[in-house]
């Protein structure tokens, strides 16, 4: 069974780390081991809320270090799931090309791409950095628009329309502010965290021991 990789993308300050803290809290199940790889160094830290070593945070300097260390990190921690956090200074295709190399595809698969954006600056980024930012939006399964409390309705509508024009298939999660990410995710019921996942993790871990 391949390790699931989730990519959390977005520009510095968009709220990626807060989002990761929320998905860790809302989606981890008993027996699941998660490796979080941070390819950026923002102010906010991943919160290790439990004490049973169910997830590990490892900071990487750049994409070259990811290529160099990913396999050894997988062997060291034997995760069920990997979350990669990186900002918009790395082209989307760059990290995609790395993770699609044969050595990684044999043991891993990208299952979900999240794009996290600040609703206040999203339109400006799309208008000014369109060719750079569009691939992130195009390939996202879920797009998180943060800080909607601080957006005029007109601006929020423009943001949603621009996203829909670029990626009509993605699930758009509108978050009022950084304090409500977790509750908004919980209410949306879009994360894999139920009985079937618990059973799947238990079976996978059982066979890994043999």
Task: Name every feature range the model reports, one short phrase each.
Residues 2-9, 14, 18-112, 123:
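Nucleotide-state-sensitive switch-loop elements of NTP-binding domains
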Residues 152-210:
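C-terminal accessory "lid"/substrate-recognition subdomains
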